[in-house]
Amino acid sequence: MAYGGPSMNPPALSGAVPGSANLKQVKLERESELRIEVSEEPLRLRVVNGTAEIFGSELPPEIWRTFPPRMKFAVFTWYGATIEMDGVTETDYTADETPMVSYINVHAILDARRRFAKASTSNDPESSQGPRVIVVGPTDSGKSTLTKMLLSWAAKQGWRPTFVDLDVGQGSITIPGSIAAAPIEMPLDPVEGFPLDMALVYYYGHASPNMNVELYKALVKELAQVLEKQFVGNPESRAAGMVINTMGWIEGIGYELLLHAIDTFNASVVLVLGQEKLFSRLKDVLRSKSNVDVVKLHKSGGVVARVKEVRKRSRNFKIQEYFYGLSKELSPYANTSSFSDLQVFRIGGGPQAPKSALPAGSTSVSNPLRVTPVNIDDRDLLHSVLAVSYAEEPDQIISSNVSGFVYVTEVNVQKKKITYLAPSPGTLPSKLLVAGSLAWLESV
């Protein structure tokens, strides 16, 4: 383990390496980190000696890793290391004040609770349940980074925790607009991120929960119920518990949705990053729940604030990554189907009840959970990202997860044909597609 014992490797001198203008070595002292923002060009990096990790995953010695443009990360060492970089960064600097000791202490406590749960009898649902950790905090407080660390440290010790991502604005497991869960069987790759092959994905279709709050809550509840059923038949996963990432909207409805998530997933540990006010509110409102610990943690000084335009750009890159790969190494397949071969639906809108059925003076309100068919010849579908639902009937769409996504590149009304990109060739797993407000202008 990177934090399991002192390094026996001798330190190296820092500074530029002769013979290359873009080759640079940095010596890190114990419990310090190298914070990096990659420029518009990829960056190569390796550990020359010592041990170091990124997002809780230890880097192999002497092996170059390539990091994509615009990626932001920190290389941390517990006992000292020398890092070598090849390329130009937007910025890079060392820092010796980090919250990592407090983070690893949280991991140690969670590990003890997992061991207790594993040793307990499976007949006792409460004691056999491992920690269900939910990470909350404002925008750009380091929530995603902390969840990666906790998951990687747990996997390094042989656990198989479940990662749950409720942040529809960015999306860690798959494209934005989704909520998802995935078992983490090994420390996360610092470049590739979360595995998608075993992910359970529900499509919300929007980048913010305020577009349809009731739908967001319904999908969160559906995901929680499915995971609960899986835990019943898998005591090891149950003992490993969950780590849940949340959105950065913590005021008004956003705060209500945080409480809804804490309650729906039966969270036992609430980690609050970067805001005293939120910690105080949650501590007070959860005071009556003796089985819930609310813990305040400092955010890292390396967290980078992102403006609205940067967030939008990040969403577009995530969609591009889904179809083309992180380094554009994939080639999606263009498929053309007749309008009659597919059915597209939106969730929300439509009258909930006719006026004649309402009390005098009342007005009809829209039903946020109504599944409404969409005309495929609607030009609004052009450049849309559509989810391929596992539902067999339209009324099962909300309760069904999705198999993947397609991107609409052309709608030919005259020929009644729709052309879309898909990650794999052949017929789609289902003819039922789900649309939201998520769109993407391809620039590859």
Curated annotation (Swiss-Prot):
Entry annotated with the keyword Glycosyltransferase: no
Domain of life: Eukaryota
UniProt keyword annotation of Mitochondrion present: no
Localization annotation: Nucleus
GO molecular function: ATP binding; polynucleotide 5'-hydroxyl-kinase activity
GO biological process terms held by the UniProt record: flower development; mRNA 3'-end processing; mRNA processing; phyllome development; vegetative to reproductive phase transition of meristem
Alphabetic keyword roster: ATP-binding, mRNA processing, Nucleotide-binding, Nucleus
Main location: nucleus
SUPFAM superfamilies in the cross-refs: P-loop containing nucleoside triphosphate hydrolases
GO CC annotations, alphabetized: mRNA cleavage factor complex; nucleus
Signal peptide: none
Sites where the protein binds ATP: E33, K72, D140, S141, G142, K143, S144, T145
HAMAP family membership: Clp1 (MF_03035)
Subunit structure: Interacts with PCFS4 and SYM5. Forms a complex with cleavage and polyadenylation specificity factor (CPSF) subunits CPSF30, CPSF100, PCFS1, PCFS4, PCFS5, CPSF160 and FY.
Family: Belongs to the Clp1 family. Clp1 subfamily.
Protein purpose: Required for endonucleolytic cleavage during polyadenylation-dependent pre-mRNA 3'-end formation. Functions in gametophyte, embryo and postembryotic development.
Protein name: Protein CLP1 homolog
Native species: Arabidopsis thaliana
Gene transcribed to yield this protein: CLPS3
